[in-house]
């Protein structure tokens, strides 16, 4: 009996996922094949290093560590304290911030922590409208931020689809918000952080910058940093920063840092995910290496190549181009919706997402555009030649869809492009 119990115990500790749960193993294996065989152009997507995967899949999953380094509510935390301190110091060094909280479990929770720290329910704040490239947590009516607080939306100029900074100033003076959110998820141009801070100071508002999408570009020195201008900066640790899925909050203000720490724990979260914090530490360490600057520069260069070649192929790019890692394609001149374009491209192994364009007449579930991004494909090693090919393959699929009477009629085009995609991806393996 004892031997049988010991055998069962050893099985628990040593049996692999494939042995224990074939259904989950098959799905994970399928996802790996999908990632290897398809071209990932979702702007918020990326591919982490094996070291990041190893840290996140480590024994730290077992460790509960409520509190902060040196001030835990559980014993046995000396190793996880060291890991969290590494993550904090690396975040501060990478972005030039005096304080960093690396515990938020997600981008939504990091922004919720800011609201909890700085606002009371019913307070007024400003954020970029979702249809102009903002985020749900910047005051969308369907999100907590839009339900609990009075959000005043700002947007883009219709004539050039650039940020309407004059409108931001006018609305701020009119509504006197306590907080102004800058940053977004689908704006392809450079943000003027200095001007936002000037407007915030004029009305006595906190300036909070959500740089989740561009954090890797800021770290790599190819996008201006908001740290010298914002009261608080929030960012995810995935996307262009190429780390695990999670959030982080930065500031140079000690008083605000204490408020943020209290808002994250115990305000919103209990025990932090130490395996994820370890993976954050690894990714931040990678971003501190000289090679990351080269990576960030390539991400932007590849986005510009993709935008330029799509324009040459007759596609309309919102605002005329891009300064960062993403671009929005307006499909109205092709008589296509974003929904149909996304599905057709996926059938051809090119992965993107439908996305509203500024002043979009279509519903968010349909959209008039698609959003494309270069971080993941650049991580794989794709360069100028590959992105020229990708732009041509996108054009083949979508021009075929324009001509076809229905999705089925574009099948041969999509199948041919799928083979061409496989020829490209076979030359750029990962996790081998």
Curated annotation (Swiss-Prot):
It comes from the Bacteria. (6S)-5,6,7,8-tetrahydrofolate binds at residues 130, 134-136. It catalyses: (6R)-5,10-methylene-5,6,7,8-tetrahydrofolate + glycine + H2O = (6S)-5,6,7,8-tetrahydrofolate + L-serine. The modification N6-(pyridoxal phosphate)lysine is found at residue 239. Keywords: Amino-acid biosynthesis, Cytoplasm, One-carbon metabolism, Pyridoxal phosphate, Transferase. It is an enzyme of class 2 (transferase). Its EC number is 2.1.2.1. The record marks 238 as: Plays an important role in substrate specificity. It is found in: Cytoplasm. GO terms for molecular function: glycine hydroxymethyltransferase activity; pyridoxal phosphate binding. Pathway: One-carbon metabolism; tetrahydrofolate interconversion; Amino-acid biosynthesis; glycine biosynthesis; glycine from L-serine: step 1/1. The keyword Amino-acid biosynthesis applies. It holds the Pfam family SHMT. GO terms for biological process: glycine biosynthetic process from serine; tetrahydrofolate interconversion. Signal peptide: none annotated. InterPro entries: PyrdxlP-dep_Trfase (IPR015424), PyrdxlP-dep_Trfase_major (IPR015421), PyrdxlP-dep_Trfase_small (IPR015422), Ser_HO-MeTrfase (IPR001085), Ser_HO-MeTrfase-like (IPR049943), Ser_HO-MeTrfase_PLP_BS (IPR019798), SHMT-like_dom (IPR039429). Homodimer. This is Serine hydroxymethyltransferase. It comes from Bartonella bacilliformis (strain ATCC 35685 / KC583 / Herrer 020/F12,63).
């Amino acid at each position: 009996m004892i031997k049988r119990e010991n055998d069962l115990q050893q099985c628990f500790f040593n049996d692999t996922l494939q042995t224990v749960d074939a259904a989950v193993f098959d799905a994970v294996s399928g996802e790996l094949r999908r990632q290897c065989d398809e071209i990932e152009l979702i702007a918020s997507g990326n591919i982490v290093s094996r070291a990041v995967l190893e840290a996140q899949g480590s024994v730290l999953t077992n460790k509960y560590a409520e509190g902060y380094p040196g001030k835990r509510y559980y014993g046995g935390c000396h190793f996880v304290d060291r890991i969290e301190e590494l993550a904090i110091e690396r975040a501060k060094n990478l972005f030039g911030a005096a304080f960093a909280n690396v515990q938020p479990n997600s981008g939504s929770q990091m922004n919720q922590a800011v609201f909890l720290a700085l606002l009371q329910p019913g307070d007024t704040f400003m954020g970029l409208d979702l249809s102009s490239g903002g985020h749900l947590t910047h005051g969308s009516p369907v999100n907590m931020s839009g339900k609990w607080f009075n959000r005043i939306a700002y947007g883009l100029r219709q004539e050039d689809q650039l940020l309407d900074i004059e409108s931001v100033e006018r609305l701020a003076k009119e509504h006197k918000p306590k907080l102004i959110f800058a940053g977004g998820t689908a704006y392809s141009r450079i943000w003027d952080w200095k001007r936002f801070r000037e407007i915030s100071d004029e009305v006595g508002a906190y300036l909070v910058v959500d740089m989740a999408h561009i954090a890797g570009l800021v770290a790599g020195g190819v996008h201006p940093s908001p740290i010298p201008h914002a009261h608080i900066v929030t960012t995810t640790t995935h996307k262009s920063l190429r780390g695990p899925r999670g959030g982080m909050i930065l500031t140079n203000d000690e008083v605000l840092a204490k408020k943020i720490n209290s808002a994250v724990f115990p305000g919103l979260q209990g025990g932090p995910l130490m395996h994820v914090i370890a993976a954050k530490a690894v990714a931040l360490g990678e971003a501190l290496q000289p090679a990351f600057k080269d990576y960030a520069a390539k991400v932007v260069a590849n986005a510009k190549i993709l935008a330029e070649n799509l324009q040459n192929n007759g596609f309309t790019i919102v605002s005329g181009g891009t300064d960062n890692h993403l671009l929005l394609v307006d499909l109205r001149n092709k008589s296509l919706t974003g929904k149909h374009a996304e599905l057709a491209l996926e059938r051809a192994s090119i992965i993107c997402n439908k996305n509203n364009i500024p002043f979009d007449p279509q519903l968010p579930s349909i959209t008039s555009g698609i959003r494309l991004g270069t971080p993941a494909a650049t991580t794989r090693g794709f360069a100028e030649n590959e992105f020229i090919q990708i732009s041509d393959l996108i054009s083949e699929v979508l021009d075929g869809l324009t001509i076809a009477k229905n999705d089925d009629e574009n099948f041969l085009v999509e199948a041919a492009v799928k083979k061409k995609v496989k020829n490209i991806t076979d030359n750029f393996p990962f996790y081998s």
